């Protein structure tokens, strides 16, 4: 199995604050690289806010050179206007890494919680605590950044599982 390090950016979409976290995965070993949030101004037009998020994410991607991206699927609340705006911010979270040539994976919030904490209904504080445990050098200063690191951790762990399953299935095909 290939143990080459892969750099992953996790993204937690949001219109005000879009969290991002970059880790490196080598086999089952995870290393913290950086994390933070890209912000948009609340008084600006929607187009200006989306543009600010897009430019901010592209800057992070250019600076930190991730090889793959993972984005949290958004929870749709009961306010359709808010859901639509969040969906547009999520579009930025998907398009920015894709434009940079990165493969982009998507994960449901409960799968991220289940993978990182072991409970699909974990609270934000539990997620932040487990992120700190799994990445001791991490300094997530916001819940958005901690959530983004959790997205990256989930991608690293599920990516490794998929690679193992693929190698096992190709071995069984070769032995037939």
UniProtKB/Swiss-Prot annotation:
Its main location: cytoplasm. Mg(2+) 2 binds at residue 72. The keyword Methyltransferase does not apply. GO terms for cellular component: cytoplasm; Holliday junction resolvase complex. Mg(2+) 1 binds at residues 12, 144. Binds 2 Mg(2+) ion per subunit. It is found in: Cytoplasm. This is Crossover junction endodeoxyribonuclease RuvC.
């Amino acid at each position: 199995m290939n143990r080459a390090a892969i750099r992953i950016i996790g993204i937690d979409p949001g219109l005000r604050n879009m969290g991002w976290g970059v880790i490196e995965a080598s086999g089952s070993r995870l290393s913290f690289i950086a994390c933070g949030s890209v912000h948009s101004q609340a008084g600006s037009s929607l187009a200006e806010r989306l543009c600010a998020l897009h430019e901010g994410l592209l800057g992070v991607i250019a600076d930190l050179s991730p090889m793959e991206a993972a984005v949290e699927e958004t929870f749709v609340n009961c306010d359709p206007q808010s859901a639509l705006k969040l969906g547009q911010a999520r579009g930025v979270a998907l398009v920015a890494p894709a434009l940079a040539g990165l493969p982009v994976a998507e994960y449901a919030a409960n799968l991220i919680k289940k993978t990182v904490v072991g409970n699909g209904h974990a609270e934000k504080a539990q997620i932040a605590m487990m992120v700190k445990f799994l990445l001791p050098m991490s300094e997530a200063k916001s819940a958005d950044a901690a959530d983004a690191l959790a997205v990256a951790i989930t991608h690293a762990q599920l990516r490794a599982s998929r690679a193992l399953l693929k190698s096992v299935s190709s071995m069984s095909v070769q032995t037939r």
